[in-house]
């Protein structure tokens, strides 16, 4: 695909006040690690607030489904629903857990199909109109989603299916595929090639930093709210989440406001924004011939992540049901698990990422090692008959998340800047579509294996 010399690419004019290292003929001066971190801070504080707010209701959102299922679907009494972890109600607990996994599969279905299709258009739009409109679209729809969840919490006796309505606005805006694409493309645009892995690592670390406090604050909000009423417990958590998302969104908009972008002149052959050929163009961009082995590297990176991310999504779809049935974990125990494992991840990454940057370790060698830790994690969890083994598995994988940051960095280095949106759209679409089938498979395996205690933990993972 030839580029018209008269048309500027997005990356050539997106950020007028940003200079890239490869454009400087002089040898850049070496910066201290601290200075390098300070100079690279842009949207990270806003992302921290948004991720902190998002983590507040992770456990409560699962617990409210359990409650609505228990009360509405099975018509159990409040006494039974409050004591499902009691051995006396083992059968009722299993019935509720099965329904939870079924609902989570429907949720995955609803939250994956539209974002998968939208990802292709978002990539093209990001290249045509810039990254900021995608940010605005996602953040607005995310706040609207949380508002609907808040209404469902206020009307606690309402059917759990009402919660599915909350996912519609964000899905139409592209879901988390839009968020991932806009963040990754934005960071790639404002970063020199040698800084991209470091910047992506910082983003991953920021995400992890938000985890421990958000889990504990969410647990405390739920606990103290429950002293007033069950309804107030859920409302307090979801209302705080909505407020945090709005504050983070405003900060993010303010931080990216100074980065200006002038749209390129429209090529007469350029696709209409909603043309089906946009999807075709995305596939052509990903699979087209490139110098050397660049195309092979791109496809290999996509394939590696597909086979790594599938079990992670499968695990996520059954994790709450798994710990609920096997260890009798609920809000407090799951919040503590999230906090402790996040702290370990933060400490490990806080040491590893700067050391990797200082030693200039080859990303191509580091990434396979990190993916191996992810595989070991699943193997250990497969035999986690005791809670401490479940913790151990997550500790082994404390650096695994950084492998995905390296993937993004390597992909962004293999394509032209004006193609970056389309390539990242393709990877976002792939990341969105595969959870559909894998979530269903894990749900069915969970329902079969939980009745056979000896193989329960092994088959579920």
Give, region by region, the residue ranges found by the protein language model.
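Juxtamembrane intracellular "pre-TM" segments in multi-pass secondary transporters
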Residues: 15-40, 258-303, 325-326
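Intracellular juxtamembrane helix-capping segments at the cytosolic ends
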Residues: 60-61, 176-192, 402-416
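A membrane-interface helix-boundary motif in multi-pass transporters
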Residues: 222-243, 444-461
């Amino acid at each position: 695909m030839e580029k018209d010399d008269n048309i500027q690419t997005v990356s050539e004019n997106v950020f007028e006040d940003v200079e890239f290292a490869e454009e400087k003929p002089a040898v850049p001066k070496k910066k201290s690690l601290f200075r390098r971190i300070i100079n690279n801070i842009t949207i990270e504080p806003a992302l921290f607030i948004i991720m902190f707010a998002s983590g507040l209701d992770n456990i409560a959102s699962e617990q409210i489904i359990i409650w609505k299922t228990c009360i509405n679907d099975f018509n159990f009494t409040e006494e039974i629903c409050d004591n499902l972890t009691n051995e006396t109600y083992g059968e009722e607990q299993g019935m509720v857990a099965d329904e939870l996994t079924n609902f989570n599969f429907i949720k995955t279905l609803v939250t994956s199909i539209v974002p998968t299709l939208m990802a292709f258009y978002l990539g093209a739009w990001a290249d045509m109109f810039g990254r900021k409109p995608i940010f605005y679209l996602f953040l607005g729809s995310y706040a609207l989603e949380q508002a609907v969840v808040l209404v469902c919490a206020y009307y606690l006796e309402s059917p759990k299916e009402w919660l599915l309505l909350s996912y519609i606005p964000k899905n139409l805006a592209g879901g988390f595929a839009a968020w991932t694409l806009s963040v990754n493309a934005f960071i790639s645009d404002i970063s020199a090639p040698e800084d991209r892995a470091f910047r992506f690592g910082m983003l991953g670390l920021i995400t992890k930093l938000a985890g421990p406090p958000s889990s504990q604050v969410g647990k405390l909000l739920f606990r103290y709210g429950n002293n007033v009423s069950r309804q107030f417990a859920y409302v307090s958590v979801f209302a705080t989440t909505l407020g945090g998302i709005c504050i983070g969104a405003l900060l993010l908009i303010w931080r990216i406001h100074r980065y200006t972008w002038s749209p390129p002149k429209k090529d007469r052959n350029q696709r209409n924004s909603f043309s089906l050929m946009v999807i075709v163009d995305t596939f052509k961009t990903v699979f087209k011939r490139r110098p050397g082995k660049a195309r092979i590297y791109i496809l290999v990176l996509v394939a590696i992540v597909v086979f790594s991310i599938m079990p992670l999504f499968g695990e996520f779809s059954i994790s709450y049901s798994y710990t609920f049935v096997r260890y009798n974990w609920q809000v407090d125990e799951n919040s503590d698990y999230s906090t402790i494992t996040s702290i370990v991840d933060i400490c490990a990454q806080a040491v590893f990422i700067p050391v990797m940057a200082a030693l200039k370790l080859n990303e191509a060698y580091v990434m396979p090692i990190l993916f191996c830790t992810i595989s070991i994690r699943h193997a250990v969890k497969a035999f986690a008959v005791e809670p401490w083994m479940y913790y151990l598995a997550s500790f082994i994988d404390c650096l695994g998340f950084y492998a995905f940051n390296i993937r993004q960095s390597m992909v962004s280095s293999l394509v032209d800047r004006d193609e970056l949106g389309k390539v990242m759209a393709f990877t976002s679409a792939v990341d969105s579509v595969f959870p559909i089938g894998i979530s269903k498979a894990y749900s069915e395996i969970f329902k079969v294996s939980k009745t056979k205690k000896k193989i329960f933990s092994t088959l579920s993972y």
